[in-house]
Structure formats: structure tokens, C-alpha cells
Amino acid sequence: MKKSIFKIALLNFCILVLAACSSDKDSTDEVIVDPPTQSDPLTTQNVLTYMVDASATKETQALFYNLKRLGETKTAIGQQDAFNSFYQDAGGYSDIKKNTGFDPAVLGSDFMFITDKNNNEQLNNWFYQQELKIVSDVKAAYAKGIINTFSWHLREPYKEDSFYTADMTADQKSTAFRSILPGGANNEWYKKKLDKVASVISNLKGSNGELIPIIFRPFHEFDGSWFWWGANFCTAEEYKKAYQFTVDYLKNTKGVHNILYAYSPDNSYSTVEDYLTRYPGDKYVDVLGMDNYGDLNSGNDGYNRANAKLKMLSIAAKTRVKIAALTETGYQVTATTPPINNWFSTNLYNVLHDNRTFDLQFNTISYVMFWNNTKDGYYVPNGTVSNASDFKTFAEKSKSALLNSLPKMYEMPK
């Protein structure tokens, strides 16, 4: 009888402890529950089975495999234009390295200037100079072992002046995206832009002549209305068709085999079903991404939403054997917008890694990328600003990875 009473008391005590832990929403301690062992079909031998490109170079295969595995334990930290965008135009090392002493694990670049109508590929041309700088940065990053990712703020096909719909007429907005589809009035124009992209990617080479892998995320943030490829200006099927055409043209027509392709809407989707509304298919996507600024600038409710969306993303990626990533995020500090206390080390870190529901569905976000710093504002604090220690603490946590704790991403494990 005493044993029975003792067992009941012990059981009640355990329930109370678990209830107290699960309701402690304000705790800033790191989650100490280790993720369960993942039953993942991905191996070093079958990696091509789950990739877009069955002819991907061995370095590109290794990047896919290592990114997928990295997300099980750590999240690589990076920044757009990290080598050239500095707060207060300080120059020198990246602001990440100024703060932490280490290079970023991810470098973001863009094809915008590379495909600009004014790029005449002459050495005295400003746009061509930007192309050369970007190529140089990508090569330097690869030589260090940094992951390279590209977005593409492609200017509209009529005047090629802007990628924002705010700068376009109603007629341009309603026809621009459809015009680049096969059979459209601007499909040849679009193919020429892709020719330029293919030429640059095909000439990204390491010291031994090997092709440098990149992650490419065309038509990003498509669920918004600020870009001319946004959801208001094309149907889901038209979006899929354009994405598929882009991949097929680069991979099959141009023979480019050093790309991982990323699908990256903004933060409007909270269910897998909605997230996949414009998904072009597993044969066309390697990375399931999401850009999310809004939720991470909206207080505790926003952090909870962001965490739930990354969990949704992780589940979708696990099901499809794809890579999950927070492809853009950040909170910009300016003269009129002060830092948020512990935004990096507590709020963002818990968004990336927390599992307060104890449902054994853990986030597996392989990388997070902050937007670029400028003269007048920053997303990543350098070593001199008031929240520098907050970022450094974030970067030094057990599930964060700068370059110093990144595995060899371009070599398959033995």
C-alpha cells in the first residue's frame, strides 16, 4: 500500500514539474532537451536522389549533405554583402568579424548589378566593377570554407529601372511576370538575363579549378506585393512555371551544375499546406527557406509565431529530405530605432532552437542570414555599439556556428 501511495505521489510530482517547465514562457535559459535521433534516409551515397541536379558537382553534393546534417545540431550564421557593407562605412573586416573575431559562416550576394542593363563588361563601368567585386568575394569566401548564397533583385523587363511595384504602372505590374514565361513577349529578354547568370556561376572556380557551389533563391518573398513577381501579379501555376523554367534553363540548357535552388517566401505562411501553394516541386527545390522580418519585430507574440513557422518549415524539409533555412531576417538599429535587449542571444536564439511544446518536433534550421549593414543602420552589430555583446553571446552559443565552428562544407564526410 505504501509503495502504491509512493508511486502515485512520485507520478504527481513529475506531472507538476513538467507542467511548471512547459508553462515557463519567460525563461531565457537554453533548452537542454537534446533532439531525438533522426531516422533520415539521406546518406553520402544517395545524396543525388534528393537533389534537384542529378549531375551536381561533388562539391555541390557535399554542400547539400553537410547543410542538411548541420541543421540537426547547429545553425550557420551569415550576412548579406558581409565583406562590403559596414555600419558607418567603417571598412576592414566584416562587422561580424569585428565583433566576434571570426568570419561569418554564410555570405549573401545578389545578381542585381551583374544583370543590370548598364553592365557593359568594361573595366571602367561601375556595374561591371560590382560584378568583379562580387565574384572576388565569393571566391574568397569559398577558399575560407564559407557558404555562398545569391538572391536576385531582377529589375522589371520594360524599362529595367526597378524591381519594386511601387515604381511601376498598373499595366506593367499586371503583365511583367507573365511576359517572361515561355511564349511571353519578354521570354527572350529573360533568357538573356539567365545567360549572364549562368556565365558568372560557371566561372566561379576554386584554386584547383573546381566549380564553387552556390545557393540560388530566385523570385524570393513572392507572397508579398512589393516585387513584380509577387502573388498579386501572377497565379500559383504561373509562378511555378517561371521557377521551373529558370531551373531547367540553367541546369539543362546552360549546363550549370553547381547550384542548390532555394524556395523562399516571406513570412505569411503558417501551415505546410499554405507554404506549398506556389511550391514548384521537389524536383526543383533543394532548400526550403523563409524570409521573416515582421514576426521578429513584433514582441513576444511575434517570436512565438516565428518559432512555430520555423518548426513548420523544419517538418516540411524533413518530410522531403530538403534543407531548411531562415533565408533572411533581422532587426535594423538606426539613430531613431534603438536595439532590443537580448534580441539576438535570447529572442532570436529561442526562435531558432526552442521547443517549448515538447512534441519532439525540433527545428532543424541549417542557416540564418541577416540583411546588410549600411552607413546609417545595422542588422549585425560591430564591436563598438551598445548591443555588441548580445550578438557575440548569440554567436557563441552551443547551437550557433560562425566559420570557426563550421565543418568542411565542400567535402563529403568519410
Predicted regions and their residues:
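Sec-dependent bacterial lipoprotein signal peptides
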Residues: 1-19
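Boundary/entry segment of secreted carbohydrate-active catalytic domains
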Residues: 35-113
